[in-house]
């Protein structure tokens, strides 16, 4: 670690800091610090932290300690604006030491990278030597394994030789999880000579290709679709470990020794100490295993100060806050120690703990005084920076800048102060976080006659003009010694802009690659044959050709066959598009093969679906016919409002905003639905749309189902539009009569621009002067008559609907053009996955968890789902945490009382809300980040998923505890549900089943109907497909009627059966995982054009290497199916070893002549519309007949010739020279060479 030296010019606020440090007060400080005194007490306002740290870092390396993790994030971001990459943030674990939860993989990776840079300052691959490390008191007090900085990461470079098996073994050692498809950090997958690795500190996973043991290529790929990202170049990958306690031979041996001494009892409580030690001895990582570090690691523990270079000073910011925080952390850590191990000890035969609880205390936090004493022993000076005065301290000549907090009068005063300051030749700077905001500030200064201009990054302000900079600075300062005034955007607006590190780790979109994961016994729906049960995947050789099939089981076609007798159906892989998983509530009866029951069920469903489609289309037709208002393009004010958004928009959010604006600018009334989980940024889209409408002189109504939501939106809209002349009012049950009248009058005379309210807005007596846009939040929660009212609005004003229930992608596609949809799948940048704990109910643990939340000034939800005993539950919570303010809420309370209670909880008048599942939807309380659910074994998966979505909605880490009674045995389904929720804890979790359940609800919301009977009858996926087909028919009819043409009713697409001697399959040595192989088959079967087939082939090549011959033939068969479907042919079969039969095919006379000329031995039977053609031989007489791709091409040539169309090439060839693909990669053999 070295002194970062003078500020770098390419860092945004470097020049500004350079100017500030020229003040005598800082020059004296640097001189004083140069002597490295053991103690140094400084006094300055909090806004001077950046300058003090920058001054001290000039003299040599420095460790800065803050009271909270958030303060550390912000200070690190500001220091990076001065010193660039010479600054590192050392985050603390999100978990407390004995919480039985392991810290997140990304946290561990970031910590190990910082410690590695401290230990190896010369390692250029990791960046320049560190000059400043910023951390919170939590990391300072937390003991760690000695020599963590010496733990070697795995480094791979293109062109290097690395034994393939050695690399895989090393990844396992570094605690990476092996999976068949990489989806989150800390995972890796192996496929032949290709290795996919998602390192904890990487933005995207990396695909590494080996040729033998040489690394030939590396490229990043996207988690969403598993395709390479060609724009990003990468030559070296540094993969840090995923845990700080690695299961080395020594650690495993020690665990085995302890486990042998105390064998687990027969009925061990999962998670007992014995259970944990037994697993660790086998090398299985367990959640929360870091807690037993003191008993497994014989060399004692180290502190952060032990990892620093000699003589590095520790600068503690706000020492008073740090001391309080340290005491709280130690107390809560202690509670978790007792809670965790008293439960866990019970797993041994004699019921005594295999480890001494006192000894385990060694992995808990160390007292602050002990850390200070240890620092003194190792020669680290201890310096403090306080805001409270002290006689022996050095007081710096720095003042905090005035703050306007968004009040216009105060902003004018600040501008006047700046004018006066620069008029006397002083220096002034205004720092804003975004480029757009910075440009807007220049305009606003100019409007107030204050000379201002933009500065380049790293430039210092000039005298006589306010320099405006884009950079990471939160609070302004006044430095008389440098004649400098610095104001920030926070000082003006009062809104805290988050320290969005330009590059937060990539947010994960919900997986688009959705392997059809089938396990034996799953119900599936076959379009033609109905509901069957999946048995297995088999490979059969027919006529010398190997093919894979799915075996399905159906009810016996014989009457009285009984449940035992079942019929089997072999589905070839090229017909996989006919299959979908059955989702639809209760388990249905299996269909009979060949019976008419399935056809009848489908006909009924189709009839019901037609009605809905007709209604949707007629509404669409009315909208098309009625002229709406075409809004004008964006104004400069619109750009100003959007630049002031305090967060980085996600890709989905930007797309949705663009789509909404494009709709508004068309003359046809908009009808768009925006789907996205609560907290994914739907409100911001509504704010921008509303503002756009107001710019055109139109009024906006925002309709919400509850008073709480109305208040939340009122606050958000008010804050976002505070600097603009827009009148926003609320109208709900809590609005008193006089105010309600005033609002209603304002709507009639046009003085109110935006009104946010509940269904009161829909009552008679509310008149509008010029309503232009209606925003509806959670439409499904309104009553029937309110929905009808909203529907009637749709034909003449723009309507934007927001829904938190996910909507199936397929439905979204089929509604295109009728109800437009935008889906937001990406979580906001700052959100972390919720840490999920599933375990037995234990009062000590609950008390510790609630206290930990109160420690960070947060709030908690406590879910108890029985109204009869909820008051008793609340009383128990009050006993556990007497200092907390506890309140009860449930659906049977009078509505006014319920809303008031939740309102007061939102206003932070209560700490813990003991409630039923009413919190499941729509509640957005960002300060509540701990959720405790009693009797979690009685909830459904989608309920658990929705409940967990209530917490972790801000920059704080969320915690969810799903508890079950320790003495009650869990049912198998309850166990499965809890295991699923425990495993799927990343954001937008891939909880396919729960999401399906929610999607069924979402589909009902959008279609506005109750169709559960039909959904159950045919299964959800097929139902949605029927909706799509019906809509397409109506849409065609509508277009045809508009053009004065007659319309044909669309027929159900027929399945094409191809049964030829073609060895076409995806070999298991090409794609080893059944799940992924099935996905490959399904993608090819579902391709609906040659272009889509080519795209699937590209993707397979990218993910698994060049296609082997059988896979290329499979693609050729997929193309032939498309050609047959386009020609109306449903059956292509090798009738014998010597002939091929095609049907149905009706040939006019000219085509019959052509057929006889091409194949003299061919037969055409007009009565059955069948053509039979001999299969030619590969050479002269006696040679074998053609097969595989040649045969497929022959059939294709025959079809195109008979239709009088040009020949179509069916085979898939490698476009590059043999042995190389388009990227110049060697593809001759994909298997690794020995």
Swiss-Prot record:
- According to the UniProt entry, where does the motif DEEQ box sit in this chain? 777-780
Q: Where is the composition biased (Basic and acidic residues)?
A: 1220-1234
Task: Give the enzyme's EC designation.
Answer: 3.6.4.-
Q: Which UniProt keywords apply?
A: ATP-binding, Cytoplasm, DNA damage, DNA repair, DNA-binding, Helicase, Hydrolase, Nucleotide-binding
In which residues is ATP bound? 676-683
Task: Spell out the residue ranges making up region: Disordered.
Answer: 1207-1234
Q: Name one GO biological process term.
A: transcription-coupled nucleotide-excision repair, DNA damage recognition
Annotated InterPro entries: CarD-like/TRCF_RID, CarD-like/TRCF_RID_sf, DEAD/DEAH_box_helicase_dom, Helicase_ATP-bd, Helicase_C-like, Mfd, P-loop_NTPase, RecG/Mfd
- Tell me which GO cellular component terms the UniProt record holds: cytosol; plasma membrane
Where does the record place the Helicase C-terminal domain?
Answer: 842-999
Highest taxon, organism lineage? Bacteria
Where does the record place the Helicase ATP-binding domain? 663-824
Q: How does it assemble?
A: Interacts with the RNA polymerase subunit beta (RpoB).
- Matching PANTHER family: ATP-DEPENDENT DNA HELICASE HOMOLOG RECG, CHLOROPLASTIC
The record describes the protein's role as: Couples transcription and DNA repair by recognizing RNA polymerase (RNAP) stalled at DNA lesions. Mediates ATP-dependent release of RNAP and its truncated transcript from the DNA, and recruitment of nucleotide excision repair machinery to the damaged site.
From the Swiss-Prot or TrEMBL record, give the protein name.
Answer: Transcription-repair-coupling factor
What organism, scientifically named, is this protein from? Mycobacterium tuberculosis (strain ATCC 25618 / H37Rv)
* Gene that encodes it: mfd
